[in-house]
């Protein structure tokens, strides 16, 4: 009788082990599905955001958005190169020091923190350049500056 | 006396018969004497040995010994019965033990059977997984999906090369980096474009700078100079690398003329920005030099270094 009872206990233990394995497998599957769903949602949101910046009226599938992003970044690099070319061309050959040769200030460029640049970029360029054209009369410049601000 | 008389007849027949056999019998008798039930049997059998001692013949003596043994057994029914029962009970333990071992073997066989059944159940579970994982699906939908994933992976790698901090492996983080970099480049292009729009005002800017020539030149920190040096060098080699470097530093490339215009525009009205206006004072002087250079006059170019020297 004792041995038969022990056998029954062994069987119960094995059944418990099997059930634990099954539950662990289920949890693993559920974790995978949950994480995969979250990842898909995150990636989808980011693809949409990138599309809005790169090609708002272009195709919406992931491969097309990535391709447009590649082309757009290369285009922006070319734009920066073209817009900065006039400053780079004015290299003072008279100075022989390498440090001065590679300095930005001799070329009319400077580095500004992006925080200060965002406000400038958001505003209309014409508003910034207008006061400079009328520096002769201080009173007029003051009156002209007030409506812009 | 009885005991001594018993001992003497045992010693007397020994020379007559074989000594080793008799010695063995004596040893056996000693063992019997050592056992506990023997004294009680001796006490009970006191009168019969005397009657047996009357015939002194050896043969009779042997018969007497056998008779004693035979008589002893029935006389001590209780003790031998107990001994037999004890023997059976002690014997039952080993009998049960093999039964127990038999039970263990049965449990082991059941365990092996359940293990085999478990294996059988596991096998069909693994087989479809193996097929699904290893098998290269050939239906057109699966092939198209595979090509789509490969295309996306290739383009993601190409974008990693264009973007700073491209070493991230998480797709979501990689996309965040791409978005931030595109926004930075758009900002940079806009700032440089504004300076282009203001190109016509360069003359007026020169006039204002000549008026402000009296401003003192503030020396910038060595670290800033090194950063400017690095940016200028990178712009000569590769614009992409320069832009990535600037975004990493949190800086934006801006023409000095634009910075000067902004500082002059904000200087008269807002006093809190005096510190900010102090920063672009040094660019004024460099702008003056550059403006002289832009004048396209050789004499002015020669004058510029002479001014910079002192």
Swiss-Prot record, chain A:
InterPro entries to which the protein is assigned, alphabetical: bHLH95_bHLH, bHLH_dom, HLH_DNA-bd_sf, IND-like
Subcellular location: Nucleus
GO cellular component terms attached to this protein's record: nucleus
Keyword Amino-acid biosynthesis in record: no
The keyword Transcription regulation appears for this protein: yes
Key words, A-Z: DNA-binding, Nucleus, Transcription, Transcription regulation
Molecular-function GO term, any one: DNA binding
Protein name stated in the entry: Transcription factor bHLH153
Family: Belongs to the bHLH protein family.
Residue span(s) of domain bHLH: 27-76
From Swiss-Prot, chain B:
Keyword Disulfide bond in record: no
Molecular function terms from GO: DNA binding; DNA-binding transcription factor activity; protein dimerization activity
Keywords carried by this UniProt record: DNA-binding, Nucleus, Transcription, Transcription regulation
GO BP of this protein: microgametogenesis; pollen sperm cell differentiation; regulation of DNA-templated transcription; root hair cell development; root hair cell differentiation; root hair elongation
SUPFAM superfamilies linked to this entry: HLH, helix-loop-helix DNA-binding domain
Pfam families documented for this protein: HLH
GO CC list: nucleus
Free-text tissue specificity from the UniProt record: Expressed constitutively in roots, leaves, stems, and flowers.
Gene induction: Repressed by heat treatment.
Biased amino acid composition, Low complexity: 1-20, 104-126
Location(s), subcellular: Nucleus
Domain bHLH: 136-185
InterPro entries, per database record: bHLH_dom, HLH_DNA-bd_sf, IND-like
Region (Disordered): 1-23, 95-143, 203-225
Keyword DNA-binding: yes
Subunit structure comment from the entry: Homodimer.
Annotated function: Transcription factor that regulates the development of root hairs. Transcription factor that regulates the development of sperm cells.
Name of the protein: Transcription factor LRL2
Organism of origin: Arabidopsis thaliana
Phylogenetic lineage: Eukaryota, Viridiplantae, Streptophyta, Embryophyta, Tracheophyta
Gene: LRL2
């Amino acid at each position: 009788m004792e041995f038969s009872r022990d056998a029954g206990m062994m069987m119960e233990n094995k059944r418990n082990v099997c059930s634990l394995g099954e539950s662990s497998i289920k949890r693993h599957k559920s974790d995978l599905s949950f994480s995969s769903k979250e990842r898909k949602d995150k990636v989808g949101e980011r693809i949409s955001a990138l599309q809005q910046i790169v090609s708002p009226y272009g195709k919406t599938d992931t491969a097309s958005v990535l391709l447009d992003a590649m082309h757009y970044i290369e285009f922006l690099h070319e734009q920066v190169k073209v817009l900065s070319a006039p400053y780079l061309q004015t290299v003072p050959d008279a100075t022989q020091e390498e440090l001065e040769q590679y300095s930005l200030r001799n070329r009319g460029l400077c580095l500004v923190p992006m925080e200060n640049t965002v406000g400038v970029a958001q505003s209309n360029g014409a508003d910034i350049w207008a006061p400079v054209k009328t520096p002769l009369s201080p009173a007029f410049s003051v009156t002209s500056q007030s409506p812009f601000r | 006396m009885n005991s001594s008389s018993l001992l003497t007849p045992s010693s007397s027949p020994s020379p007559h018969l074989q000594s080793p056999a008799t010695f063995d019998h004596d040893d056996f008798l000693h063992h019997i004497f050592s056992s506990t039930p023997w004294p009680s049997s001796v006490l009970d059998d006191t009168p019969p040995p005397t009657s047996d001692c009357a015939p002194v013949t050896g043969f009779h003596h042997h018969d007497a010994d056998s008779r004693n043994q035979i008589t002893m057994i029935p006389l001590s029914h209780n003790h031998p019965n107990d001994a037999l029962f004890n023997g059976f009970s002690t014997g039952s333990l080993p009998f049960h033990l093999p039964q127990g071992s038999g039970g263990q073997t049965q449990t082991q066989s059941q365990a092996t059977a359940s293990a085999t059944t478990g294996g059988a159940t596991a096998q069909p579970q693994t087989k479809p997984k193996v097929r699904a994982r290893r098998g290269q699906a050939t239906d057109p939908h699966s092939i198209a999906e595979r090509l789509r994933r490969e295309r996306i992976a290739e383009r993601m790698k190409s974008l990693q090369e264009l973007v700073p901090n491209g070493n991230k492996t998480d797709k979501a983080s990689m996309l965040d980096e791409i978005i931030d970099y595109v926004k930075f480049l758009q900002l940079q292009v806009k700032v440089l474009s504004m300076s282009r729009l203001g190109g016509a005002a360069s003359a007026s800017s020169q006039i204002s700078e000549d008026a402000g020539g009296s401003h003192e030149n503030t020396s910038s920190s060595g670290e800033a100079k090194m950063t400017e040096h690095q940016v200028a060098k990178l712009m000569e080699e590769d614009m992409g690398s320069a832009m990535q470097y600037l975004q990493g530093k949190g800086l934006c490339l801006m023409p000095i003329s634009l910075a000067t215009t902004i500082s002059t525009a904000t200087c008269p009205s807002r006093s809190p920005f005096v510190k900010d206006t102090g920063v672009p004072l040094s660019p004024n002087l460099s702008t003056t030099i550059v403006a002289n250079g832009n004048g396209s006059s050789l004499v002015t170019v020669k004058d510029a270094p002479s001014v910079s020297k002192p």
